[in-house]
Regions:
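Peripheral, non-catalytic segments that deliver or gate enzyme domains
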Residues: 1-251
């Protein structure tokens, strides 16, 4: 994880020495290479998640056939188990990102047979709130801007995004006007947020990278992923729907 309060600081996971406690979290200075202990690991944990302030609040591991995951309240916290599930079971969960409040986090979990987006609280993780589900398609993953979850993506006949943030939705609409007929993806932005690195693609257009001025809406192409691949060499994408052998409709 990058750290908002330190441009040279990152959090990294290391296994074994010098902690000898499985995976643990360390703070590293990328300019000097110096590391120091941040959050000590414990048995069976394989992955930690830190919020934008660098506080490790979630951990996930393995215990036999189950995947327990737990949460804490900050440095020196006592960890407690939040849930235990089978990796491919209907109750499996996938961490997406932290919410606006320190104790909130987004996760993907089943709803009516489809993967959906939920908002949970570390204080009451067993009663999450459903934020978005689609009757036909699984939610595929988060849309992250500046390490914030601003929406979730899903794939129908075309890529789609359900935004949770009005400012992000307005910015996405501006980018779509900038690259009409293409699907824009925000890759990165300048520190002041005015210059945007955007990846635009379509079924008959290989990815193109543009530098977009947010204030003026002007853009210029800076790179093409496949410059020798023309649109006349690509086919238009069409949705296909058919019934499976058991009668279920496959979108």
């Amino acid at each position: 994880s990058m750290l908002d309060d330190d441009p040279n600081g990152v959090l990294v996971q290391l296994c074994g020495e010098p902690t000898d406690a499985g995976w643990s979290v360390f703070r590293m200075d990328v300019a000097t290479g110096h590391i120091r202990a941040h959050t000590r690991g414990f048995s069976s944990v394989g992955r930690f998640h830190a919020d934008p302030d660098g506080v490790v609040r979630l951990a996930k591991g393995a215990s036999g056939k189950n995947l327990p995951w737990g949460g804490g309240e900050g440095g020196g916290q006592r960890w407690r188990e939040l849930a235990r599930y089978q990796p491919l079971g209907a109750d499996a969960v996938e961490f997406v990102g932290f919410g606006a409040k320190p104790a909130e986090f987004y996760m993907l979990r089943d709803h009516a047979g489809r993967k959906a987006l939920w908002l949970a609280d570390l204080g009451n993780p067993r009663n999450p709130r459903l934020l978005f589900s689609h009757p036909e398609f699984d939610v595929e993953g988060p849309v992250l801007w500046n390490d914030r979850v601003v929406g979730v993506a899903y794939q129908g006949d075309r890529p789609e995004i359900r935004f949770l943030d009005e400012d992000a939705q307005a910015l996405f609409a501006m980018l779509k006007r900038t690259v009409p007929g293409s699907f824009p993806e925000l890759v990165d932005r300048s520190a002041d947020g005015n210059r945007l690195l955007v990846r635009a693609s379509a079924d008959r257009q290989p990815p193109v990278y543009l530098l977009v001025d947010r204030d003026t809406g002007r853009s210029r192409v800076i790179a093409r992923a496949y410059p020798d691949l023309g649109s006349d060499m690509l086919s238009a994408m069409n949705g296909i729907h058919f019934p499976a052998r058991d009668g279920a409709r496959v979108p």
